[in-house]
Design a protein with these regions (language model features):
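PLP-dependent class I/II
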Residues: 1-194
Length: 194
């Protein structure tokens, strides 16, 4: 889903490129990520395994279709020139750099530079990120503003991993990302005092 969103000269590698596993390889993609069409629930599955595709087709035929306007928009999205992705990647690279730079300046926060997509996982100086995220929404604000973070534990298959981590999407404008990190920093300072 994020093949256009790779950074720093890296090249996307698809499971579909691995020889001799065609019958075990499935690729899933969607317009919501590829073309930033949030809410457009239109995607596709690619596989050379005919039995898998036959089963998926049965499931797809039993489902209602996405709204017509989403289908029309998705069709038009494929007409965008390749330069669209170059511009989008340039913007997301800048947003990523702003976010990571700002997070690295917050005491106790550990974060790595993402190589793809438009999210980062940040380790916070808290025991339970989910409790902290709820607290941010329910009990904390700066000038009547707060931030909404996704606890990262739910993104791991192993129970307990990511317990003190959050996933942050860098989909907002750079100025809003900087403001969000300022609020997060103040939130962490206040949370520690409890």
């Amino acid at each position: 889903m994020y093949r256009e969103f790779v950074y720093d000269g890296a090249q996307h590698f698809s499971i579909m490129q691995v020889p001799d596993i065609e019958q075990n390889a499935i690729m899933i993609d969607s317009v919501s990520k590829r073309f930033s069409m949030c809410g457009a629930r239109i995607g596709w599955v690619v596989s050379k395994n005919k039995e898998v595709m036959k089963s998926i087709l049965k499931f797809a035929q039993a489902r209602l279709s996405p709204p017509t306007y989403s289908q029309i928009g998705a069709e038009k999205a494929f007409d965008v020139p390749e330069t669209y992705f170059e511009e989008v990647l340039k913007e997301y690279t800048q947003r990523r750099n702003v976010l990571i730079d700002a997070l690295q300046r917050v005491e106790g926060v550990r974060v790595s530079m993402p190589k793809g997509a438009f999210y980062c996982i940040a380790e916070l100086p808290v025991e339970n990120a989910e409790d902290f995220c709820i607290w941010l929404l329910d009990q904390f604000s700066v000038d009547n503003q707060t931030v909404m973070l996704a606890p990262a534990e739910g993104f791991y298959a192993t129970p307990g991993l990511g317990r003190n981590q959050v996933r942050i999407a860098y989909v907002l404008e750079k100025e809003k990302i900087q403001r969000a990190v300022e609020i997060l920093k103040k939130g962490l300072e206040c949370y520690k005092k409890q």
